């Protein structure tokens, strides 16, 4: 695969975080455990919300969709990663790499947009509680979610189509855990100025605007909470936002660790930061949203109790 221009029929080699057999075995069991925890946690969240009428509210509607997105996200990357860790053949086809890239980019954008919509939901619940039912009607919730899907699908499509115009020369060894946009652009031997410009422009629209919206929402929420005279009511109001605030902090924090740096400085060390947003964040979200949530505790308890009774 060395030398010369590479055609679309060529393959990439996903070498991962380490080429040491001993370390690869450790990484295999670590990622397998994390994947299983992520799948079980997010499936339980989805089942609990769908089966319990008490959780048929806008907040839990978006949470179920966030769990679905996280489930889809890890399934797009981790199984292939596990196969590579156990196999001598670490190749991924050109088409397979672009497919993985498309879903990766789309689902990260979708996660981001859903978190922004959830921030709006929390803003309405805290700042306009009397109008919550009408402001967050089922029709509006479906419309907002549909908009999130359309924007994220278009975002992924734009960058994947632009990537098909990129030419790769020389070695196609990727010292990374999956086909990631920044890594692929660094391997390019053609002009990637268009890709870079579109990446910045669309990134500002898809990520910075929703992030700014989240910040503004929480500034208004905090102002509203501080005006509440009762300390117990302040705590109750803040506790309704704490889980979402934790998820937002984890998502944007890990994303900034990877992407807030110039393209030419991207290195193998960024694999560790990538694991944080690609594996750890989807795994932690079910715990964040259910840890101190009495409604979720009750729904999960009823769900598990019902299934255990069927088995006995």
Curated annotation (Swiss-Prot):
A GO cellular component annotation in the UniProt record: plasma membrane
Any single Pfam family the record assigns to this protein: 7tm_4
Family: Belongs to the G-protein coupled receptor 1 family.
Location relative to the cell: Cell membrane
Domain of life: Eukaryota
Disulfide bonds: 97-189
Main function: Odorant receptor.
PROSITE patterns for this protein: G_PROTEIN_RECEP_F1_1 (PS00237), G_PROTEIN_RECEP_F1_2 (PS50262)
Name used for this protein in its record: Olfactory receptor 1D2
One of the record's GO molecular function terms: identical protein binding
